[in-house]
Amino acid sequence: MLVSRVLSRVSRSAGLRSSFSSVVTPKRNQIPIVASRFHSLVHGTPNKLVAVPVSLRNHGTLDLNVLQRFGFFSSSSAEPKGNESNTEVPKTGETSENVEVGKATDAEIDFDDLSRDDLVKLVSEKEDLLKVQQKDIMEMKDKFLRTYAEQQNLMDRTNRNAESAKKFAVQNFATSLLDVADNLERASSVVKESFSKIDTSKDLAGATPLLKNLLEGVEMTEKQLAEVFRKAGLVKEDPLNEPFNPNRHNAVFQVPDASKPKGTIAHVLKSGYSLYDRVIRPAEVGVTCAVENQEGGKESAA
């Protein structure tokens, strides 16, 4: 392409031939150098285009204006470089894509080249790994269920304890008042028995009405205390003529009584009390015992 441009410019400018011959004729011995340089421009690589004018300038064979006149430094000469550089970029991209495709193909080939034994071994390894993971999942599930059950039991136990603490908060206080209730009961019962024996005709001071009012006041106090106990959940128990229960009764003595079955409560010394079905004081009682054995022993001794 450079040769055609040079020849076209030489043919168009006939006047320049004389100037060119005047420059070239005294130095005929250097024409082979220019020819060889020019030959290197045509058949050489694009990267050597800049080296030619530099070497010519150093040797002084041609003038810079002459070289420019013949198109060695024209702006159009740089276009092939750009085109060539632009054409080289996609080559690099194509090469990288080819490499990636080659790698993927090699991977597929490697996977396809696995033998049947290798595939069976790989599947067995995956199955073993899956079994281990399933076992871990079952263990974690079991731990979760156990922990959840423990938390649920703890919540239920905490609620029961809170409810129990609320119910039995007055237990100690109520226990300390039981003796007061017993004393009021004894006083009312004794005074009532003695009051029936008083002769009102001999009562000159008028103490009988006062004693009667006192008895009524004691009975009212006893009833009021019993009502307070009932509201607080404290219940009085009178187990007379009931079967003896060691969980709720305390046997103090035995009474031989043939009219009642063995183990029946014949006497009550102290009444029992329970707070929401919890016994806070067992009843002190006297229990009947068998009489037949004693009579049989007396007959045998006689």
UniProtKB/Swiss-Prot annotation:
Read off the HAMAP family from this record: GrpE
Q: Where is the transit peptide?
A: 1-39
Q: Which InterPro entries match?
A: GrpE (IPR000740), GrpE_coiled_coil (IPR013805), GrpE_head (IPR009012)
- Report the protein name in the record: GrpE protein homolog 1, mitochondrial
Residue ranges of the region described as Disordered: 77-97
Q: Which organism is it from?
A: Arabidopsis thaliana
Task: Write down the superkingdom of origin.
Answer: Eukaryota
> What conditions trigger expression of this protein?
By UV-B.
